[in-house]
């Protein structure tokens, strides 16, 4: 749910509602002071006030009394709310429209609600409420609502402040008595209405069509900001012919969407500088304009079209405290470790090989021409026939597999292997669920028997003859779905989702051996020169535009980022696309290097 900046009663930061604070003492029936009193107290208020004037000493006392009641846990039933407010209505009654409210958009992202309040109070009149909408990450959406004391101020705001230039951005102001304009704005950006009073509006990232997500003409950072609802609607156009005026600029770019304003940058003599800005009704129209017109010729000059700097939030990935972890002094950079994706191998990971017994160097070897029947599945795995699985230290013998895999192996392998970081996310339960009732029964209770006859018959439909499987298991345990492609129609698709290993499973010599032995299909990329405060969640979000991300990881050392990471996709095509369109882009001012991870 999107939070919002808001006008708060001084000292009410510890109130009950985390989203909205009353613009007056809760429960007071009216906010209008006597004109003489308001006139007397006007000079006492500065721009540092919290957006609400205290009308008189009595109201201040009542406010303190109400705050005291809050601290003891009692709550007022009639709390002020900008979208369902009626001064004279009681709790539980239906609220009417508020005709004193306006919706403001195209606000600079760095603008605070206090500045908006002071501006409106100076240019228009007394302000009783200000709220700037934010996205799920607490960043400004560039729009909000302002409520005035009287309805006449709304008309004045529309006359004097609409198209008012604020830090280079023309404000768009509309009447919004029912909150409809605010509701539409939040729906367009994929947010939810402040206060939770408008249900079923959805949240999270904005769903974009593939024509945008896969468009090579649109920078990835523009797409990610559009998805997150943080993108403005103004574009910057350069290399214009000097005879192009704002009317021609508007005429051309109206093909891409509804143009609200077009401007040509001029020098001190009033002559065109060959550049300008175009503001659209919606951010997605601005993105479409980039796709349609960047590089196109206007009067024999190719236009350079991009998002205006004020439409893109800056320092997207800066940490809240502004501190960026650095490499040790004197160290110019770091190379790749010996683990997968360049991750260093720790001493604890070196012991993983012992847990898996003979499974390590051979890497699910299948040394023979194939499986050759289920009772010969061991071979290079180290099973030694299923009765010889004692060699796998973590299992402790086939006789215990009925206990270990109770419920058709629904337990995760984290417990079975004895390590939290070598687990299978969902166990083998879902994976083998469709392989036949005998398979389930065998693994649930009778797999400890010395022969696999009943099990073999039960899985004949799913695994049948595996003689065609030679040369290992495809991509290794972290993507066993690809390995089972040729094992029969019943298992490939099932294992794709179920036997996806957790982070760190194949790090260490066992993983290195298996990956080296059985190879990779190129689903994973390695990313260098990442900001040190970038999290794996941000990394995943950044690369999600290239395809479905199965796994993302930031390489860490002593709890600090090493400035590199890996991203694994569901297909080699997505990985190649990521290398193609993401290599060289900047994240927090750092140009990242993206390439296929050959160590995966």
Swiss-Prot record:
The modification Phosphoserine is found at residues 17, 431. PROSITE patterns: RRM. There is a cross-link at residue 53 (Glycyl lysine isopeptide (Lys-Gly) (interchain with G-Cter in SUMO2)). GO terms for cellular component: nucleus. The modification Omega-N-methylarginine is found at residue 406. Disulfide bonds: none annotated. Residues 100-178, 233-310, 523-599 form the RRM domain. Keywords: DNA-binding, Isopeptide bond, Methylation, Nucleus, Phosphoprotein, Repeat, Repressor, RNA-binding, Transcription, Ubl conjugation. The modification Phosphothreonine is found at residue 13. GO terms for biological process: myotube differentiation; neuron differentiation. Residues 1-101 are annotated as: Disordered. Signal peptide: none annotated. One of its GO terms (molecular function) is mRNA binding. Coiled coil: none annotated. It is found in: Nucleus. It comes from the Eukaryota. Transcriptional repressor of the myelin basic protein gene (MBP). Binds to the proximal MB1 element 5'-TTGTCC-3' of the MBP promoter. Its binding to MB1 and function are inhibited by PURA. Monomer. PANTHER family: RNA RECOGNITION MOTIF RRM DOMAIN CONTAINING PROTEIN. This is Myelin expression factor 2. The gene is MYEF2.
